[in-house]
């Protein structure tokens, strides 16, 4: 295995482990992984207590796990689209050369 591949693998391992070491088990209770929506809503209510939202969501997931699943599914679909785009362009470039 070439040296640059070893460096790349070590870089991936470091990038994977760094957040786990930095937060060392602290989670949502301490606010590390709180969503921006909740923080923004709290700030709006603090600034203007009489504010009324324009609309309500037509469906809310029944649990946080389902919400996380939908978010992960959305990220996976986006990654597939981006991967397809890069693969398509790479194959097109290789065919031209």
UniProtKB/Swiss-Prot annotation:
Pathway info: Cofactor biosynthesis; adenosylcobalamin biosynthesis
GO cellular component: plasma membrane
Membrane spanning residue stretches: 6-26, 68-88
Keywords: Cell membrane, Cobalamin biosynthesis, Cobalt, Cobalt transport, Ion transport, Membrane, Transmembrane, Transmembrane helix, Transport
UniProt membrane topology term: Multi-pass membrane protein
InterPro entries in UniProt: CbiN (IPR003705)
Gene Ontology terms, MF aspect: cobalt ion transmembrane transporter activity
Pfam families linked: CbiN
Biological process per Gene Ontology, one example term: cobalamin biosynthetic process
Transmembrane helix as UniProt keyword: yes
Subunit composition and interactions: Forms an energy-coupling factor (ECF) transporter complex composed of an ATP-binding protein (A component, CbiO), a transmembrane protein (T component, CbiQ) and 2 possible substrate-capture proteins (S components, CbiM and CbiN) of unknown stoichimetry.
Family annotation (PANTHER family): COBALT TRANSPORT PROTEIN CBIN (PTHR38662:SF1)
Family note: Belongs to the CbiN family.
Function description: Part of the energy-coupling factor (ECF) transporter complex CbiMNOQ involved in cobalt import.
Protein name: Cobalt transport protein CbiN
Native source organism of the sequence: Methanococcus maripaludis (strain C7 / ATCC BAA-1331)
Lineage: Archaea, Methanobacteriati, Methanobacteriota, Methanomada group, Methanococci
Gene expressing this chain: cbiN
């Amino acid at each position: 295995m070439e040296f640059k591949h070893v460096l790349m693998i070590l870089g991936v391992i470091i990038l994977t482990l760094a957040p786990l070491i930095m937060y060392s088990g602290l989670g949502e209770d301490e606010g590390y992984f709180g969503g921006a929506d909740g923080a923004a809503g709290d700030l709006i209510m603090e600034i203007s207590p009489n504010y009324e939202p324009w609309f309500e969501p037509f469906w809310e997931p029944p649990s946080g796990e389902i919400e996380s699943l939908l978010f992960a599914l959305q990220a996976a679909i986006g990654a597939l689209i981006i991967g397809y785009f890069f693969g398509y362009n790479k194959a097109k470039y290789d065919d031209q050369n």
